[in-house]
Amino acid sequence: MNRLIAAPVAAVFLAAVPAHAALKVGAQAPDFSAQASQAGKTFSFKLSDALKKGPVVLYFFPAAFTSGCTLEAHEFADASADYRKLGATLIGVTAGNIDRLTEFSVSECRSKFPVAADPKAAIAKSYDALLAVYPGHSDRTSYVIAPDGKDILAYSNLKPDDHVAQTLAALKSWRAAHPS
């Protein structure tokens, strides 16, 4: 019975608390390595390696297989070709375990981009992307990181609606100033 009550109460708190991103535009993005999965296959993801190929869109989400996170994953999957055209690597990160994320990478990310496990939320903490009311879980925060490792966008909003639009706009602006 308590679990039946806890989920709706947590949802109300999550919706009522504004999200924030503390990693400022222009700040150096912390490097990290994590177990990730794409299309059901696990591998090691390292931010500094991805940045050698171009900008990185790093988005944190609270939990796999929740309604908002599923919607957001679908939106990122639908826009994955746009990110590739802009030369960007897209990766989602959450405080889940790799087995659950391997399934999520196929069903909700539609095998279009990787998701990484941050089981102790250390990566989220280094980006100041933790949910204040739900310790150990990532906030819904998106970053665009230039190849030099500098943050060019920090966007936080618990609603998943604008994360794709915000990150694509930042990438297009950066790409216009840095043609290939």
What are these regions (language model features)?
Residues 33-55:
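A short beta-strand-turn-helix
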